[in-house]
UniProtKB/Swiss-Prot annotation:
The keyword Glycoprotein does not apply. Its main location: nucleus. ARM repeats lie at residues 100-139, 179-218, 278-318. It is found in: Nucleus; Mitochondrion outer membrane. InterPro entries: ARM-like (IPR011989), ARM-rpt_dom (IPR006911), ARM-type_fold (IPR016024), Armc12 (IPR042834). The gene is ARMC12. It is linked to Spermatogenic failure 90: An autosomal recessive male infertility disorder due to severely reduced progressive motility of sperm. It is a peripheral membrane protein. Interacts with TBC1D15, TBC1D21, GK2 and IMMT. Interacts with VDAC2 and VDAC3 in a TBC1D21-dependent manner. Interacts (via ARM domains) with RBBP4. One of its GO terms (biological process) is positive regulation of cell growth. It comes from Homo sapiens (Human). Expressed in testis. Highly expressed in the mid-piece of the elongated and late spermatids. Expressed at higher levels in neuroblastoma tissues and cell lines, than those of normal dorsal ganglia (at protein level). Expressed in breast cancer, colon cancer, hepatocellular carcinoma, lung cancer, pancreas cancer, prostate cancer, renal cancer and gastric cancer, but not in their normal counterparts. This is Armadillo repeat-containing protein 12.
Length: 340
């Protein structure tokens, strides 16, 4: 006689349990071996990887000694290298500057000069990495004046090479430096290029470009050049609610500074003439639709954008010089129709 069905099923359950137990035990054992091997595994002693450089920083701090890594990299940059090697060395130097603060501070202006030479390299990736390295060194006060000497060169690169990564690196560097007055003539020449970058489709580059333009809008001798700069017919698309919140915020800051600048007494008294396709006409002209865009941004999901949109509205309705006067004085023109 064969076994009954209940007996057969019972034995089948026992077999399944045994197999599961064995499989689970095997998996646990393999996991134990993997963890044990990982603990015993020693990383390579020397590497240019970010992990290795971070380890050098920890070791230096722990033992209070100079790792020599940054100096070794700078020295290797003076040797003849191909473009790829130079890019990798510069990338490693940048990381070292951020991680090994004491070693970076011990560098000299000669090192900054060496990095400046890299801006003349024929390869755009080398130029970009050199800009990133100079940006890292610009966080150390004693190097700022020396790095400022390269401002004109950086502006030239931004305006003559259409490369998004280079634009981002160059603009980040410029935004981290106080730009001296002697670069203002060059700034006027590159204004159209900055405006083109702002109107491109690369958010990181756009944000850096508009930050620089916002800074320059506070310079009395550059305000007209910015306002009279030619823009695309769809410039106000930058104020659409669908734009990135970070970009919207920076564009609104830019608009507020332009509005305050053009209404300042020393600027307002002059009869300025603007091109029909100028930034001024796009933002503040009779046919501008900026007011509609601003009202839509007042209900934007991001609070920073809401607040900044309100600031621009206030600056348009009540210019700074009029806000300082007695309440009996009214602005000559309103950008917003009366909804009563």
């Amino acid at each position: 006689m064969g076994k009954s069905i209940p007996q057969y099923l019972g034995q089948l359950d026992i077999r399944k349990s045994v197999v599961s137990l064995a499989t689970g035990a095997g998996a646990i054992y393999l996991l134990y071996k993997a963890i044990k091997a990982g603990i015993k595994c020693k990383p390579p002693l020397c590497s240019n990887s970010p992990i290795c450089i971070a380890r050098l920083a920890v070791e230096r701090e722990r033992h209070g000694r100079d790792s020599g890594e940054l100096r070794r990299l700078l020295n290797s940059l003076e040797c003849k290298q191909d473009e790829y090697a130079k890019s990798m060395i510069l990338h490693s130097i940048t990381r070292c500057v951020y991680l090994l603060e004491a070693e970076a501070s011990a560098c000299t202006t000669d090192d900054i000069v060496l990095l400046g030479y890299m801006l003349d390299d024929k390869d755009n990736s080398v130029k970009t990495q050199a800009l990133n390295t100079l940006k890292a060194f610009s966080g150390i006060r004693k190097f700022r004046l020396k790095i400022q000497e390269h401002s004109i060169k950086v502006l030239e690169l931004i305006s003559t090479i259409w490369d998004t990564e280079l634009h981002i690196a160059g603009l980040r560097l410029l935004n981290n430096l106080p730009l001296p007055d002697y670069v203002h003539p060059q700034l006027r020449r590159v204004m159209p290029a900055l405006m083109e970058i702002l109107q491109s489709d690369y958010i990181l580059a756009q944000v850096q470009a508009v930050r620089l333009l916002s800074y320059l809008a506070q310079k009395n001798d550059l305000l007209y050049d910015i306002l009279n700069c030619q823009v695309h017919s769809n410039f106000l698309n930058l104020f659409q609610p669908t734009q990135s919140g970070s970009l919207l915020y920076e564009v609104l800051v830019f608009a507020e500074r332009l509005s305050e600048g053009r209404n300042a007494p020393h600027y307002h008294v002059v009869k300025w003439h603007y091109n029909e396709q100028s930034l001024h006409e796009s933002l503040f002209g009779e046919e501008s639709r900026l007011a509609d865009r601003l009202l839509a941004l007042v209900i934007h999901p991001e609070e920073d954008v809401q607040i900044q949109a309100c600031k621009v509205i206030v600056s348009l309705q009540y210019p700074q010089d009029l806000r300082a006067r007695p309440s009996s004085c009214q602005p000559s023109r309103s950008y917003f129709k009366n909804t009563e």
